[in-house]
Amino acid sequence: MELSVLQYTGKDTGRKVVLSDTIFGITPNDHAIYLDVKNILANKRQGTHKSKERGEIAGSTKKIKKQKGTGTARAGSIKSPIFRGGGRVFGPKPRDYGFKLNKKLKKLARKSALTYKAQQGNISVLEDFSFEMPKTKMYLEMLQNLNMADQKTLLILPAVDKNLVLASRNLPNTSVALVEQINTYDLLYSKKILISETALSKLTENFNNA
């Protein structure tokens, strides 16, 4: 698949790049995508939830009423889960929701996500660029020139560019990531993928050497 190389002003440079079929043209594996996204979201969970069981509730252990003769159900402790303020049965406890996936599956999931984006025509290759100042207005103008101002976008860079990161930080629908940082969730969550020429070369090299 060939894509035109665009300037950040939206103009066509007249050059084209070829997307590797081993990365952007595979048969997508939906189950790999599902597992990787599930893994990413699970690893983001704090897992600090906690409720008290009846043995952890502070209170008297005195029997609250006599066993027989009241006409109501027998009750032994104010800490019982059936009473207000009592413990919770099988309540949540702190835990780690994360689980491990092998690198091969994660790699397949990222390739599948990139293939879907390429098939949908949602990948754009930009000529290498940088901003002289970290101006949000300049970043917004770039998105407007590319007709992406109202869509969720992900800009993939080969290395940290402080001005671009700061310029994009105040825009709610855009994010910036390095080639090494991209994951399946971010790729699918973003409607449009912007990638610089150098980042594309680095991405291809990383996948082929992994």
Swiss-Prot record:
Pfam families: Ribosomal_L4 (PF00573). It comes from the Bacteria. GO terms for molecular function: rRNA binding; structural constituent of ribosome. Keywords: Ribonucleoprotein, Ribosomal protein, RNA-binding, rRNA-binding. Part of the 50S ribosomal subunit. Belongs to the universal ribosomal protein uL4 family. One of the primary rRNA binding proteins, this protein initially binds near the 5'-end of the 23S rRNA. It is important during the early stages of 50S assembly. It makes multiple contacts with different domains of the 23S rRNA in the assembled 50S subunit and ribosome. Forms part of the polypeptide exit tunnel. This is Large ribosomal subunit protein uL4. It comes from Amoebophilus asiaticus (strain 5a2).
